[in-house]
């Protein structure tokens, strides 16, 4: 008797649920306030329109879909801007997970000794799974080296990203055999800074690198040639803002320095000259011309250019300016 009652109730309940399920869509259908007809959404025009009388019930509707079109799944994945952010500065592009170094649980409580040992083992295995082969270990080491040098040189994120892409290209085209990881990473960072008009001198990059300057120059020429990188000659004017800022000089000095360099370029004086030396001499000359005097030794210390070079380029800049006048 009891079982029969239960079965009967369950059957009635299922029938009631089915009735509710069937009736739910009818409640969601919009009806026209004028004629009671069905209202449809015209997504192309952003309007809700009655199919019977043509009344526009709503207009300027919000299009909640993407503004781009994709014709296959590959295009959809490439154009989509949702999901976890990716970056070329990590060997796995930031798609894997990390186990935090803090030995605390979700509530901020310290872990016991056994739990700490367990987490240490998990971190070790997690790191091994993230770098499963020698190629990934190579990439991880190189990208870490790029990040270290870029941080020491004060280079922005865009330069680091581009340097990472250059290194990945060198790795994929098998350009590393016979060359050190540090050498290719240094060359990639220097080329990236040149491409994005945030140059650093060869001496500056060599000072933060773990390789000697000769290997750095040789590897840089090789990478640029093999990857067909478009690297324009360094413009001395690109160094001026940084040097002027380091010397705490006003905008007037920076503006005058650019004029001196422009005159020298028009006169052909800059050909074959170090851009850093020309920028240092322009800063020194413009500071004297605008009565914001700095000594040659101060400019030399900031720019890492010898005082002899500053004096020689200084004379050439003044001669070019006089010729332009």
Swiss-Prot record:
CC annotations in GO: transcription preinitiation complex
Cited CDD domains: CYCLIN_TFIIB_archaea_like_rpt1, CYCLIN_TFIIB_archaea_like_rpt2
SUPFAM superfamilies, sorted: Cyclin-like, Zinc beta-ribbon
PROSITE patterns according to UniProt: TFIIB, ZF_TFIIB
GO MF: DNA-binding transcription factor activity; TBP-class protein binding; zinc ion binding
Domain of life (superkingdom): Archaea
Alphabetized InterPro entries for the sequence: Cyclin-like_dom, Cyclin-like_sf, TFIIB, TFIIB_arc, TFIIB_CS, TFIIB_cyclin, Znf_TFIIB
Residue ranges covered by zinc fingers (TFIIB-type): 28-58
Residue numbers binding Zn(2+): 32, 35, 50, 53
Alphabetical keyword list: Metal-binding, Repeat, Transcription, Transcription regulation, Zinc, Zinc-finger
Residue ranges, compositional bias (Polar residues): 1-13
Region named Disordered: 1-29, 73-93
Sequence repeat residue numbers: 144-227, 238-319
Family assignment from sequence similarity: Belongs to the TFIIB family.
Function description: Stabilizes TBP binding to an archaeal box-A promoter. Also responsible for recruiting RNA polymerase II to the pre-initiation complex (DNA-TBP-TFIIB).
PANTHER family assigned to the protein according to its UniProt record, in alphabetical order: TRANSCRIPTION INITIATION FACTOR IIB, TRANSCRIPTION INITIATION FACTOR IIB-RELATED
NCBIfam families cross-referenced by the UniProt entry: PRK00423.1
Protein name: Transcription initiation factor IIB 2
Species assigned in the record: Halobacterium salinarum (strain ATCC 700922 / JCM 11081 / NRC-1) (Halobacterium halobium)
